[in-house]
């Protein structure tokens, strides 16, 4: 069974919408998802949210995943950093802000009952050119893992800089 949730509507491809394995929950804020809406415990979730911090999404997500379940989360600095750290057109260019965002993501994931198994940068920039990151989480007791966040941020900026400031490399 596949579940798809979106605060918007009419965005899910018809092929998926008409698949009986897909339950589409439109006009639904992920912060308030409950077991009544998603009665089956999920093995996996992919999270790509806008205009809201993952800090607010991870706790309810934990309640929907089965123990040992996994989630892939797109970490968007423009929605994690705070308004005062976001530049023109919603773009975060400062590597120090990216580093801070990733440190907070690790903390928020752990606080919400997840272990971060993997962390990398997305090879695809956001629409305005934002560098974004991907976190791979597992529900269960928090296990401390070490990531070289500075090296990750440096690599993301160096690699994606070679592809210009546009959306996709």
Map each language-model feature to its residues.
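Short, small-residue-biased leader/transition segments that mark boundaries at the very start
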Residues: 1-2
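Flexible, glycine-/basic-rich loop-and-beta segments that form/coincide
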Residues: 131, 135-169
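Conserved SAM-binding strand-loop segment of SAM-dependent methyltransferases
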Residues: 20-31
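Short alpha-helix
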Residues: 98-112
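A short glycine-rich, Lys/Arg-flanked "PGG" loop and its adjoining helix->strand segment in the class I
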Residues: 55-72
